Amino acid sequence: MIIRLAGMSVRQGCLLGLLMCALMMGVALVLQYVYGLTPCPLCIGQRIAVLLAAFVFAIGALHNPAGNLGRGLYAGLAALASVLGLAVAARHVWLQSLPPENVPSCGPGLDYMMEVLPLWDVLSRVLAGSGECAEIHGSLLGMSIPQWTLLGFAVLLLIPLGMLAGIVIRRR
């Protein structure tokens, strides 16, 4: 699969990544607005990572650089956003796997924290997670929503890795 992705142009790879990001955000918005699931702070962090990756992919598709430098830049930034999302999703899955007595207590809402705390404090508290992040709201095929998101970020990461592999293959 990586070899197939390596053969794509920058525009094709970025459009594929953008499509994957749109799919991930579409599912998140359906879960929120159709099924009424309120996103927890870690869910919002994962959405931010998807939007960052989507932004990089969109700019890369529009720019469509011809050289390896541009290809590497967009692939590297998209990989960074994907790894960020992967890390937040992994933290979310870990919180959900904790026994109930080890789950952190619920903290104030994200809106309140954004109003009264400095940005770095908000980020550290959001990434630490809270009790609401440990709740499991159903499953699909035996996997929770954060587990599916973790899988989504792993698949998303394959796209910039394939783009980077294209640089290595072209140099040979």
UniProtKB/Swiss-Prot annotation:
Disulfide bonds join C40-C43, C106-C133. It is a multi-pass membrane protein. It is found in: Cell inner membrane. The keyword Transport applies. Residues 1-13, 66-72, 167-172 are cytoplasmic. The keyword Chaperone applies. Coiled coil: none annotated. GO terms for molecular function: electron transfer activity; protein-disulfide reductase activity. The chain crosses the membrane at residues 14-30, 49-65, 73-90, 148-166. Keywords: Cell inner membrane, Cell membrane, Chaperone, Disulfide bond, Electron transport, Membrane, Oxidoreductase, Redox-active center, Transmembrane, Transmembrane helix, Transport. GO terms for cellular component: plasma membrane. One of its GO terms (biological process) is protein folding. Residues 31-48, 91-147 are periplasmic. HAMAP family: DsbB (MF_00286). Belongs to the DsbB family. Required for disulfide bond formation in some periplasmic proteins. Acts by oxidizing the DsbA protein. This is Disulfide bond formation protein B.
